[in-house]
Amino acid sequence: MNIGFLTRRSSLRAGSVTVGLLLTLMSLSSTAGAQQKLSKRYPAAKNVRIELRNISGTIVVESWNKDEIRLSATIESKHALVLPRQIDQNLVINVMSDNRGKGDVGDINFKLQVPVNSIIDLETKRGNISVANIRSDLVRAHVSLEGDIELTNINASNVVAQNVTGNIFFEGEFSLGGNYEFKSNKGDITIRIPGNSNFRLVAASSARKIALNDFWNKNFKTQDGRRVVGDVGDGRSSVSVTNFSGQITFLRK
């Protein structure tokens, strides 16, 4: 057996592993070095308006028991700008405007902790939107291309959730006289509300996939299975649900 040959081959293997490891570490270091992190706090009234226009990346909003806003962001590209502005005590973040003409600026992932009564108005082209534990006049989430929307423990007078591709989940309550609109081109829409909810529903599904479950009653009128119109209880809230290719499901919580 040629021991020298085996030793040289082992050394080559060890060298290859070492080089591979170094390249991996260099890649991770480069990625970490290019990434920016932003963390800021702003004083806020209890009914402050939060307006965020993103391009790509996740948006997470949740309430906390403080009269201030805590903004955290992870910015993928060192060339991307995030310039939050307070206007009349409201917080405006417009990534689209701040980076106009720059081309692809990568993902920017946001997390905001806000007063429970904050008005929430969110948009992104790509990425998931999650909003939790808000009681206010408005919660709006709009994904213009692809991403899921999840609204949990929401009690708002007006709710708008729209996307093109992705699922929409709403769990909360319908307020007296409130307006609620849910719309997706491709994805499932699930609405989970108390069994004693009162609302007038207009639901449309080109795929004929509408499941009202416990909320179905004889007052509903259907049109070829593609459209359902009717009242649940006294119909004091207005609910519109449109889905072009996915399922519409109502669940009782």
Language-model features: locations:
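Intrinsically disordered, low-complexity terminal regions
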Residues: M1-K253
